[in-house]
Amino acid sequence: MDEKPTTRKGSGFCSLRYALALIMHFSNFTMITQRVSLSIAIIAMVNSTQHQDPANASTEGPVMDLLSNQSRGIKDFSTRAAVYQWSTETQGIIFSSISYGIILTLIPSGYLAGIFGAKQILGAGLLISSLLTLFTPLAADFGVILVIVIRTVQGMAQGMAWTGQFTIWAKWAPPLERSKLTSIAGSGAAFGSFIILCVGGLISQALGWPFIFYIFGSIGCVCCVLWFTVIYDDPMHHPCISVREKEHITSSVAQQSSSPRRSVPIKAMVRCLPLWAIFMGFFSHFWLCTIIITYLPTYISTVLHVNIRDSGVLSSLPFIAASSCTILGGQMADFLLSRNLLSLITVRKLFSSLGLLLPSLCAVALPFVTSSYIATIVLLILIPGTSNLCDSGFIINTLDVAPRYASFLMGISRGFGLTAGIISSTTTGFLISQDSESGWRNVFFLSAAVNMFGLIFYLIFGQAEIQSWAKERTLTRL
């Protein structure tokens, strides 16, 4: 794909498109904190004794010693919140319900965002998710069934909010700035994971577990106000954009029409190997990422024998690394493109290779360094950090090959990713239940193998040119 080096015109971090990227960063931050809130709160929701156990309180680790006196003094507040008798099986159903909800709306919401406008679809999803977060403590009082229903609907709302972002970027992001803008927006999820893991437990101890939902649900409502105020579907209709920036964006994306359409070329998509390369990349990427997100606290606790409070802080460190690598990767990718140092497909394959190969090497090395506390933590930080370099690779490749259908295809891509996450979580649970030491080794070896499969497939079939079926056709009637 040939692109004119016009990035300097109308560019700059003070431009409106970067403000949109920050709002999307905030919205992704909000959604991930709302999604993970229950994972933090449920420890207090179902356990009436652990947070009061003197033995647990007296076991200090290397990270949280300075907070020990404060945490002991404020524990009594958490006893005011209700405690529920939910079995581990019931908790598993509650956790998985939001993922099933996301899968239900990923594809249709991406399609509808392309037709009716991403601003309304995404904004509605964010608002619904925030309101349901606020009502989660009340729902818990009415019974576990209502909690499962709310989490499922919340997942459907978040599915609406995740995929439609690419419809906006197809119209707002100049080709030579796509990696940078999407990485700024996408890093909000990693930063949100870092924050919720850091402060979630402290909020529960200080104020009670319901305030985890109240605080992050309220933050989501504030984000909705910013969303509906600042976000517009395209630069042509934004009242605050400068003429210079508008001309820069419209001229940059002129060759990649993303106009609304009423039909989707499903057959052509199914036969398109470059799309399957993207799907396999998502499958591989989400396989290992889901294991890290879901089982990282468990791994740190069981392998390193770290107490719960230290485990929460240590579990948050990889996500600040992931957020940083996402932004740095986007900056580096666009630098290589703007200087014409590498072609677009070379950049996509380079960052995909780094994002799949490096975490695989770290995962394979993990079972051999368990005797070293520092080495284990460093590798655990590097896995999600290097993995997020994929955000400048196949993650945004749909904007290159089919910008008109970017949200629809992003929905399918995330569907592959969530499917991989469900399979990997189930497989991990089975493997570590048989034998902890060999089980973890097999988990990491299998994850590396899946990553290598996705990488090889993408390197062979990945492309960065607009596909023929994704181009807007002009019909001439005789």
Curated annotation (Swiss-Prot):
Tissue specificity remark: Expressed in the liver, kidney, placenta, lung and thyroid (at protein level).
Residues glycosylated per entry: 28, 47, 56, 69
Membrane-spanning residues: 98-118, 130-150, 183-203, 211-231, 273-293, 317-337, 341-361, 363-383, 405-425, 442-462
Gene Ontology MF terms in the entry: symporter activity; urate transmembrane transporter activity
GO CC aspect terms: apical plasma membrane
Catalysed reaction equations from the record: 3 Na(+)(out) + phosphate(out) = 3 Na(+)(in) + phosphate(in); urate(out) + n chloride(in) = urate(in) + n chloride(out)
Coiled-coil stretches noted in the UniProt entry, renumbered to this chain: none
GO biological process, one term: sodium ion transport
Keywords, alphabetical: Cell membrane, Glycoprotein, Ion transport, Membrane, Sodium, Sodium transport, Symport, Transmembrane, Transmembrane helix, Transport
Subcellular location: Apical cell membrane
InterPro entries assigned to the protein according to its UniProt record, in alphabetical order: MFS (IPR011701), MFS_dom (IPR020846), MFS_Na/Anion_cotransporter (IPR050382), MFS_trans_sf (IPR036259)
Membrane topology reported for the UniProt record: Multi-pass membrane protein
Pfam families: MFS_1 (PF07690)
Family: Belongs to the major facilitator superfamily. Sodium/anion cotransporter family.
Cited function: Acts as a membrane potential-dependent organic anion transporter, the transport requires a low concentration of chloride ions. Mediates chloride-dependent transport of urate. Can actively transport inorganic phosphate into cells via Na(+) cotransport.
PANTHER family named in the record: SODIUM-DEPENDENT PHOSPHATE TRANSPORT PROTEIN 3, SOLUTE CARRIER FAMILY 17
This protein's name: Sodium-dependent phosphate transport protein 3
Organism per entry: Mus musculus (Mouse)
